[in-house]
Amino acid sequence: MGYARIFLLFTPFFMCNYIVSAFVRNDGDPSLAMVATLCGSLFNVVFDYIFMFPMGLGLPGAALATAVSPVLSIAICSRHFFKKSSTVRLVRQLPSPKLLAQSCQLGVSGFVGEMSSGVTTTVFNLLLLRLAGNVAVAAYGVVANYALVATAIFNGVAQGAQPLVSRCYGKNDAAGARKLLLLGSGTALALAAALYAVLFGSTGPIVAVFNSENSALMAQYAFSGMRIYFLGYFFAGFNIVAAGYLGAVDRPVEASATSLSRGVVAIVACSLVLSALFGMNGVWAAFPASEAITACLTLFLLKRKKRTA
């Protein structure tokens, strides 16, 4: 409870951190946004240890370190608004309902993307618990931890491309925006190949990091799970980049459809169907199958309005 209370108390700072970082990045200062993010993350890692052990604060100390990290990031990003090159200023103004509605529309895709990890975790845990018990759930914990890192990499590619795509869209440069989409998609594919090559060659040691009890059964489940599950990133990278592109060119409905498919509809449907047909391997295969289905949907959506964006 102590951890949750401290964490929830600082929730507004987490939200503001996303907003401020996005403004700084889109206003031509991505380096500062990156430095702010890195400093916040490093502060969290270092002070997690300091607050928990040398200072003896335990879990509340870990919560405090996590909670303060976005405050530090916001403080660093705020430097941008005092620069002469900044085109963004804080002014007193009533909120515009029209702009708020537009922002909410464009934000649905990101919301669904963030929510999807929770949906996937819940569905997979329930299915694996029914199929093979607690050991299978522990194996999925290993897969999910590495999957979070992989997803963050592709989110980084999408967020890096987004301001450039938006700039092209603002200039009515549809060809330039499409070139950036191709570049981002190619980068995502190359990263997926490199990621899978490392994973395939080092699956055993990678799994062993989270297998302190040396459970042979858990290692076996996680080993096969990693190799099947991570095939999905060959499609997921493209889907994440494409969803970011669609949002950047003011196509919120298509962006939301892509995110909703990969985050909720396709992943749940594939999990239920494939687990019934193939057991545990079907659960692992649900992720690549759902991402492949979403990639087909995304290609259709991109092609349908290709002449306008």
Q: Which residues does each predicted region cover?
A:
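Short alpha-helical transmembrane segments in multi-pass integral membrane proteins
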Residues: 1-10, 54-108, 165-232, 273-309
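Hydrophobic faces of transmembrane alpha-helices in multi-pass small-molecule transporters and flippases
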Residues: 4, 8, 31-38, 76-79, ...
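Hydrophobic alpha-helical transmembrane segments in multi-pass membrane proteins
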Residues: 6-15, 41, 74, 110-122, ...
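Short runs within selected transmembrane alpha-helices of multi-pass transporters and secretion channels
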Residues: 6-25, 33-41, 62-75, 155-158, ...
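Small-residue-rich hydrophobic transmembrane alpha-helices
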Residues: 14-33, 139-203, 236-258
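Transmembrane alpha-helix boundary and packing residues in multipass membrane permease domains
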Residues: 22, 49, 66, 79, ...
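Hydrophobic transmembrane alpha-helices of multi-pass small-molecule transporters
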Residues: 44-48, 74-78, 148-152, 196, ...
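Helix-terminus/linker motif at the lipid-water interface of multi-pass membrane proteins
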Residues: 50-57, 118-145, 149, 167, ...
